[in-house]
A protein has these predicted regions:
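Flexible coil/turn and secondary-structure edge motifs
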Residues: 1-231
Length: 231
């Protein structure tokens, strides 16, 4: 996002839509993952890329800066693992620097793994929606760019994807009504199965971004909650 585009976004009262790349204009990316051998989760001690235990599911969520978002989820009972990465765009194996150019199409996201016997997807999605402003488009507070957009990318078997999509639509629709009653605009959250996004994949971010606020307790990454609850 260039200076002028960011300035205009910060002075906008409605949802922001920044310029996004196409398949032809997106950065070409790399041939290898930026984190090929991730370490175990620094808080939970679990693998961040599986294999998952029988019955566990995962979903990819974007709600602005992924540092603070990841911490929200690893603190929940029933969440078995989290990691941060990039999804929703075109560029394969992108770096953080590339994503920040706005030329990959990716959002900063968290891959959340949970045990449905302990915590429901509805609860996880309520936490996600209540802890950012999903009416801002390509922006969260002073963070401007498509990488900060609100997204929900269901993952798994066809049955799991269908169920996750249905739950996500219900939670977002209900929350949109509560936001509107509180004076907010339309919700801009994308709900798309991960496999149907342009690249169709979730790419792990670099090691320094994984569990960032555990490694850097004084790190800065505010949550842009509206104060409106899901009820």
């Amino acid at each position: 996002v260039d200076f002028l585009e960011r300035l205009m976004a910060l002075n906008s009262s409605g949802p922001v839509r920044t310029q996004r790349p196409t398949l032809e204009t997106a950065l070409k990316g790399g041939s290898a993952p930026v984190l090929p051998d991730p370490a175990p989760h620094t808080v939970l001690g679990t693998p961040v890329t599986g294999p998952w235990k029988p019955g566990q599911e995962h979903i990819v969520l974007g709600l602005g800066c992924f540092w603070g978002a990841e911490k929200l989820f690893w603190q929940l009972d029933g969440v078995e693992s989290t990691s941060v990465g990039y999804a929703g765009g075109y560029t394969p194996n992108p770096t953080y620097r590339e994503v920040c150019t706005g030329r990959t199409g990716h959002a900063e996201v968290v891959d959340v793994v949970w045990d449905p016997a302990v915590i429901s997807l509805e609860t996880i999605l309520r936490v996600a929606m209540e802890n950012h402003d999903p009416t801002q488009g390509d922006r969260q507070g002073n963070d401007v760019g498509a990488q900060y957009r609100s997204v929900i990318y269901p993952v798994g078997t066809p049955e799991q994807v269908a169920e996750q999509t249905a739950v996500a639509r219900d939670v977002v629709s209900s929350y949109a009504e509560r936001l509107k009653a509180a004076g907010y605009g339309d919700v801009t959250t994308e709900i798309i199965p991960l496999a149907e996004t342009p690249a169709g994949e979730y790419y792990l971010a670099e090691d320094e971004h994984q569990q960032y606020l555990d490694k850097n307790p004084d790190g800065y990454c505010p949550v842009h909650a509206t104060g409106v609850t899901c009820g």
